[in-house]
Swiss-Prot record:
InterPro entries: ATP_synth_asu-like_sf, ATP_synth_asu_C, ATP_synth_asu_C_sf, ATP_synth_F1_a_nt-bd_dom, ATP_synth_F1_asu, ATPase_a/bsu_AS, ATPase_F1/V1/A1_a/bsu_N, ATPase_F1/V1/A1_a/bsu_N_sf. It is a peripheral membrane protein. It is an enzyme of class 7 (translocase). Gene3D superfamilies: 2.40.30.20, ATP synthase alpha/beta chain, C-terminal domain, P-loop containing nucleotide triphosphate hydrolases. It comes from Renibacterium salmoninarum (strain ATCC 33209 / DSM 20767 / JCM 11484 / NBRC 15589 / NCIMB 2235). Keywords: ATP synthesis, ATP-binding, Cell membrane, CF(1), Hydrogen ion transport, Ion transport, Membrane, Nucleotide-binding, Translocase, Transport. F-type ATPases have 2 components, CF(1) - the catalytic core - and CF(0) - the membrane proton channel. CF(1) has five subunits: alpha(3), beta(3), gamma(1), delta(1), epsilon(1). CF(0) has three main subunits: a(1), b(2) and c(9-12). The alpha and beta chains form an alternating ring which encloses part of the gamma chain. CF(1) is attached to CF(0) by a central stalk formed by the gamma and epsilon chains, while a peripheral stalk is formed by the delta and b chains. The record marks 374 as: Required for activity. This is ATP synthase subunit alpha. The gene is atpA. Belongs to the ATPase alpha/beta chains family. It catalyses: ATP + H2O + 4 H(+)(in) = ADP + phosphate + 5 H(+)(out). Produces ATP from ADP in the presence of a proton gradient across the membrane. The alpha chain is a regulatory subunit. Its main location: membrane.
Amino acid sequence: MAELTINADDVRNALNEFAASYEPGNAERVEVGRVTTASDGIARVEGLPSVMANELLRFEDGTLGLAQNLDVREIGVIILGDFTGIEEGQEVHRTGEILSVPVGDQFLGRVVDPLGVPIDGLGEIQAETTRALELQAPGVTQRQSVKEPMQTGLKAIDAMIPIGRGQRQLIIGDRKTGKTAIAVDTILNQQANWASGDVKKQVRCIYVAIGQKASTIAEVRQTLEDNGALEYTTIVASPASDPAGFKYLAPYAGSAIGQHWMYSGKHVLIIFDDLSKQAEAYRAVSLLLRRPPGREAYPGDVFYLHSRLLERCAKLSDELGAGSMTGLPIIETKANDVGAFIPTNVVSITDGQIFLQSDLFNANQRPAVDVGISVSRVGGSAQVKSMKTVSGTLKLDLAQYRDMQAFAMFASDLDAASRQQLTRGSRLMELLKQPQYTPYPVEDQVVSIWAGTHGYLDEVPVEDILRFEREFLEHLRHSTEILTTLAQTNKLEDSTVEALKTSIVDFKKGFFGDGANHLVGAGHEEFDSLSEADVDQEKIVKQKR
């Protein structure tokens, strides 16, 4: 067997050739960090000097984290998932990706978490693309004024606090005053637009549930499905059981999904239910990250938290497709205190607010809109002409009615004009009541408010106002073309007004039984009048409140 010989020159030449051909640029640099502490959904990581703000990091067990605090020696990371498997000393790797969420039409009718992962058990979602959660809002030159109506189907709102497409309208009130009900009714009211198939009319809806009970979210989903509204709605759910980081991110995830449609020239309605819980989650995260607290222990940038979110709602210019995203943020108050820190912040950011008063709600005035301090700063220009015509003095009439009502509590007798004001005001308040999940088409609202403001309901007992309205609208629907004309033209022409006058006079004759002395109540039974002998000096006294 030949002896193996090694020549030193051959070895030297081979090493020189390898060294000459080596290119450092082909070497991959891998940064590895290590967990120093992990608890309460927050981890602190050493290393990773090149990490970006809002970059996704991957822990050893596959859990993702979001880089937040970029300090000199360590990084504060929000853990996006279960943190029980993350321990001190474990490796952390960069992904090189900014936090983003998948988007597209396939999300309609689905329930997803703040990372865009479906949680409704209906399988995977084939996304069209992804969109970063933190995006710059449209600039001034990329917007145009709000000029298209966003009908809620609620008489009290569409008449006095109108909302336009691209507007941000705050819904604020104590717990259990009907805030979510208004938002859900607004979604249900878009059904006719969706069924039309016209992209310019259709509104895609996003319901972002932040810190709600899982049973409440399931109830909202079931309501939308039962009423045929789930097919054009996406639900982004971060229930109360989710970590604070998920609740903080949920509104941005919903906004990113909506922006994809907005920049495609489509119309979007997004509801944040509610931003109070998002602010509390952000406060918890910030305190755990050891950021300095400010007023009410909120961090100093809590205003920016909401402003950068709500500024994404806009009506885009024609050059960008004229799409829109309308925002309905919800804020929960404590004891009707709208002057608290978070409520005043969001009021100053939005284009108006709908204040729901718990006293009105408990008095069965639902929706419990307090017309006195509710306002829409830009929606009036988007109101349809017929509604603007009939509701012009409605807000003033109700304000005068409330003043007169307070005065009448202490006055022994009133003049005829004051009594007339109280009579009409009480009927207008009754007319603005509306059952839940029954939004009205705008033409029905116009007819109802026209009848109330022009005195055609003054003779109708207050307890029969809603029955009169319901039966009169049914009469118009079957016997005339008035509602069809209003829906097509959105104008209250003189000929339409004359036809309405004739119809309501004829209907009142039948409603009151051609002037017979019938009792008009909740039931439909008829009773004979009692003789004076049977009613000997009987008096009915109406107690004053």
